[in-house]
Amino acid sequence: MRRGAGRLERAWEWLALHKLIQRGKELELLHRAMGFATLALVTLAPLLIVVAAADPLVRGGFPSWLSDGMGLSGRSARLLNEVFSPPREVIGTTSAWSILMLAVFGVSFGGSVQNAYERIWELPAGRWHRVWRQATWMLVLMAYLYQEVQTGTTVEGFSRSFLTTVTTLFFFWWGPWFLLGGQVRWRELLPGAIASVVGLAGLRAFSTLVFTPLIVTNALSYGAVGTVLVVSSWLIGVGFVVYGGALFGRWFTEHHWVPSHDDDDGDGRAGRGEGG
């Protein structure tokens, strides 16, 4: 019994899961995920609505983007469309000043994500002139979401799954590297990108099974507010996966990623790249 208990204790120490849990508490992971959802709904969603309304291919606009991400179909997708569909003249009634303000708010969302990555990797806060990184990241994010929706209507089956996996992996591999100015090496960011892809796939499956009927139920009970609450809950899940995946990636890199001699900085922690 003592030998078995000793082995379990050594296995627990080797896994170092307690350190991952501690990191999550220090980062206030759930609190950050809720902040991610709030900013996404308040700053990112209006910008995406305007961008989707300008879609020359006219494939459903912003609601189709949201339905695709949540894995909704049928009645739940129609209810979501009723709540989030903008008026047809949204582009004509949106002034240049309004679009500029939406862009500024969208960049603030990118800044929030950048700050979270800096906290996860324990790096100093980026200087104000790095706002161009946040803006560029936002543009790439919108391009990523756009291609996800467009390929969803033209590519099916294994090809769609493969394309989604590759583009999502690239985005979550490139995104932290770019926002952090190259201060963390590519190889150290790979585990976090993989964890984010797996987490989003699991969230999509959960959303299809749970949120699909929940949207219908909430719409009947609470109307449009019920639908927005479900979307907010899903966005909290997305934030948890995005930040949790990056946090898992750093933990895995430090405790289970075998570094090369060049990467070891002498204190047992993964090496860092040059700042940029």
Q: What is the predicted function of each stretch?
A:
Residues 1-276:
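Membrane-embedded alpha-helices and immediately adjacent juxtamembrane helical segments
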